[in-house]
Curated annotation (Swiss-Prot):
Protein name in UniProt: Accessory Sec system protein translocase subunit SecY2
Stored Gene3D superfamilies: SecY subunit domain
Top-level division of the source organism's lineage: Bacteria
Keywords, in A-Z order: Cell membrane, Membrane, Protein transport, Translocation, Transmembrane, Transmembrane helix, Transport
Species of provenance: Streptococcus mitis (strain B6)
Taxonomy of the source species: Bacteria, Bacillati, Bacillota, Bacilli, Lactobacillales
């Protein structure tokens, strides 16, 4: 028993459970002075925004202080990553502290947009001042977002899984109810349900293969015995981005939806804005095509976030390692980036077929939206499980060795 509680993995796991308790408790604290009986408060985007909020740690269904979730922070990370590729801006050359501060400023800007859009749409109880309630709820939602960011940082440093655990718990708590409600709304024949169950098993098998498949690049390491050279290699995943593209595309595409809601309150009589907002509504052809395109784009971007050729080549050069037949430095960087690009396209096509293809059914019936999102949800869920599993496995590695004496 003493050995179990002295384990680093167990200690970190218990700390993560404590943080999850705080998260679940906070997600049950509702915003004040709001009529909870009104469910369709965000117009036609309610179902999608509630679903996407659940994927990012939010809870629009119960209108809690965590309703917006980690979506502003995740969207800020995407934008920052895109901006950092521009050498003219020089964002990556600044100090880490300055970069973190600017990321938080960007998170604050997006949090203000989303929180204000939600607060203006909330059904306020008639006995209270609408302006004061909107202001107070906006501040509470922004504070809730930054509290979740802080909670994620705590879990990353002292627990297991970082922000992934919060997102995972939000999915487990909220998504099953969305799926059940969809089955109750859309009457699907039993045969189709059985077929979907079989396809789910096949998809899960393919997903496991894509996540565990590796392309091995032989690497020569200084001081390594010839007997072990066949075990020395650089691993590149068949789908380098994993389930991150789906997770971030849901967060990223929710920002325009919130922005259109906010602009609709500011310019209520603007015909052009109303027409554009209607065309970009969830389930419309424009939104579906943008969703599929961004999903493919993010599959490539996050592949390079996961495996950066410049960083790997620089690390190998400093440690005296090299890939057989490739010169160290820029040649190694170009070689690795070429492989990552090739596999990111393969992963992007897999993501588009599995997570983007079902979205085409939404063009025929918008009620199928949440069902069409399930394959992407499986990809995201699988990636999270594998990430946490690998982290726990790494923490327990030292405990597998027995003392010499």
């Amino acid at each position: 028993m003493t050995k179990i509680y002295s384990s680093i993995a167990v200690k970190k796991g218990l700390y993560t459970l404590f943080l999850l308790f705080i998260y679940v408790l906070g997600s049950r604290i509702t915003l004040p002075f709001v009529d909870l009986n009104s469910k369709d408060f965000l117009g036609g985007s309610t179902a999608y925004l509630a679903f996407s909020a659940a994927l990012t740690g939010g809870n629009l269904r119960s209108l809690s202080i965590f309703s917006v979730g980690l979506s502003p922070w995740m969207s800020a990370m995407i934008l920052w990553q895109m901006f950092s590729y521009s050498k003219k801006l020089g964002l990556s050359s600044t100090a880490i502290e300055i970069q973190d501060r600017r990321k938080m400023y960007l998170t604050l800007l997006i949090a203000v947009i989303q929180s204000l859009a939600v607060s203006l749409s909330l059904p306020v109880q008639s006995s209270y001042s609408a302006i004061l309630v909107v202001l107070m709820n906006t501040l509470l939602l922004i504070a809730g977002t930054f509290f979740l960011v802080w909670l994620s940082d705590l879990n990353a440093s002292m627990g297991i899984g970082g922000s992934i655990v919060i997102l995972l718990s939000s999915i487990v708590l909220n998504i099953p109810q969305d799926v059940i409600e969809t089955f109750q709304t859309v009457h699907i024949p039993t045969g189709i349900i059985v077929l979907l169950a079989l396809l789910t098993l096949v998809f899960s098998y393919l997903l496991a293969i894509m996540y565990r498949a590796r392309y091995l690049v032989p690497v020569n390491k200084i001081g390594l015995h010839n007997r072990f050279k066949r075990y020395s290699y650089l691993e590149i995943m068949l789908n380098p981005a994993g389930g991150m593209p789906y997770m971030y595309v849901m967060s990223f595409l929710s920002v325009p939806a919130y922005l259109f809601i906010l602009l609709g309150f500011i310019f209520p009589n603007h015909a052009g804005l109303a027409a554009l907002s209607k065309e970009f509504m969830v389930g419309k052809p424009l939104w579906v095509y943008v969703y599929i395109s961004v999903l493919f784009l993010f599959s490539i971007i996050f592949a390079f976030v996961t495996m950066n050729g410049e960083e790997i080549a620089d690390r190998m050069k400093k440690s005296g390692e090299y890939i057989y037949g490739i010169y160290p430095g820029e040649d190694t960087s170009r070689f690795i980036n070429g492989l990552v690009l090739r596999f990111s396209v393969i992963g992007g096509l897999f993501n588009v077929i599995m997570a983007g293809g079902p979205m085409l059914f939404v063009l025929f019936d918008e009620k199928l939206l949440r069902l069409a999102m399930i394959p992407g949800l499986f990809m995201m869920f699988g990636g999270m499980i594998f990430t946490i599993r690998d982290e726990v496995k790494a923490l327990r590695l030292n405990e597998t060795y027995k003392p010499l004496i």
